[in-house]
Regions:
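Amphipathic alpha-helical interaction motifs in eukaryotic regulatory proteins
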Residues: 11, 15, 94, 114-117, ...
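Amphipathic alpha-helical segments in well-structured domains
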Residues: 7, 11, 109-110, 145-152
């Protein structure tokens, strides 16, 4: 209900691209305002995303690629897919485990992109297929720092288990002991799923977590 394709023949164009099934792809995104009308499109445009390298923790919370930084006429590699408008083949989705091990929809762009690159797949943006996206000032659901911390630590547990103690410490410094201790209890109760996903990525990975952060 909050997205519209601006590119009217998007499905035909997508089919003609003959994309590799071993990857995950996003398209361009233009936000539009409260009038829900394409004639009111604002100027900002996102074409894929990149890791926020301010520090080790924010790296899991991506930033948009500004349209001025890329060639919008051809498909290009991007560090992270842009949320709300990405696709993959079902075979690839199942291979990397999709959203298994995650809570709701926080940090999933980084999660899927990291796992894809670790497994040797493509992470790309198709900039000439555009969706318009209604970005709300406030989401219609309750967000929780526990869910964000859970997903950030789940990424590390599954994709970079040796760094898990370090990231627990970083989360405690950022969010406080009470929140992170609750997250650790919840992770412990979900350990079968988390460990299953960790073993999945360990089996298919040809790159390390650190290598997956760079194109």
């Amino acid at each position: 209900a909050h997205c519209r394709f601006i590119t009217k023949d998007w499905l035909q164009k997508l089919d003609e691209l003959n994309l590799s099934p071993n990857g995950i792809y996003c398209c361009g995104c233009e936000p539009f305002n409260d009038k829900m009308d394409f004639s009111y499109l604002v100027k900002a445009k996102g074409l894929g995303a990149r890791f926020n390298r301010d520090n080790k923790l924010t790296i899991l919370n991506p930033k948009w690629n500004p349209s001025s930084s890329v060639d919008a006429t051809k498909i290009f590699d991007t560090e992270i897919i842009l949320g709300a408008n990405y696709i993959s083949s079902k075979k690839w989705w199942d291979k990397i485990g999709g959203h298994h091990g995650f809570r709701r929809n926080l940090r999933e762009e980084a999660f899927l992109s990291i796992k894809t690159r670790m497994a040797g797949g493509l992470v790309q943006c198709i900039p000439f297929i555009i969706t318009a996206h209604k970005f709300r000032k406030k989401p219609p659901f309750t967000t929780s720092p526990i869910n964000a911390a859970y997903n950030e630590l789940a990424i590390i547990y599954i994709c970079a288990n040796d760094l898990f103690p370090e990231y627990v410490k970083l989360e405690k410094e950022y969010r406080g002991n009470d929140i992170v201790n609750e997250v650790l209890l919840q992770m412990d109760s979900n350990m079968y799923e988390l460990e299953t996903e960790r073993q999945r990525i360990k089996k298919i990975a040809i790159k390390s977590f650190e290598e997956s952060l760079y194109i």
